[in-house]
Amino acid sequence: GDSRMFAGKSLRLGGSLQKDGGTGAKCGDLSAILMSNTPKWADMCSTPPRNTALLADWNEKLPRMAEEVSRADVTTLAGVPSWMLVLLNKVLEVTEKDDITQVWPNLELFMHGGINFAPYKQLYEKVIPSDKMRYYETYNASEGFFAFQDTPHSKDMLLLTDHGVFYEFVPMAELDRESPRALTLGEVETGVNYAVVISTNGGLWRYMIGDTVRF
């Protein structure tokens, strides 16, 4: 059917942001820092309002978010599956609805990342019983945005090669050696587990981020 994704709003669920008492510098979760630096026009496409989304106290933030987002026409979700599920259940509690499709009939996409989605899939299908609902995974960290799922028919993710990150891949079987090989993208093989090493335009040089990938 026809998509209404851009006709509604994106529900963004991030962390908290505050100012350091000594220096006045902004500090907080990466998601909150990114949110605080998005252009103002993006707020028109998003819910909840920025001042609510960046609240530091979760006990204050959760019910306030649930009240505010339940009144919006939400078509997409973006966040970590565990925390998003808590919010969705709070929305159902506030609205006294049976499932999320009764609150947001036009909801069709959840862009998730941060943790393995597999243990949450059935829980989401119960809360959002909709055939049109799609789930797309992203792979990012404080060090950079690395990959995202670009097709609904495969769980593979597309590696981003033009986003200021140079990748090297160390075979896990060689990781404990004194001089393991660090392979470029053109040298990797399918079916092999690799430790990810990155150099970035943010200043990281051959930094091992602690993740493993397989092509």
Tell me what each language-model feature is:
Residues 2, 6-32:
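Carboxylate/His-rich catalytic cores and anion/metal-binding grooves
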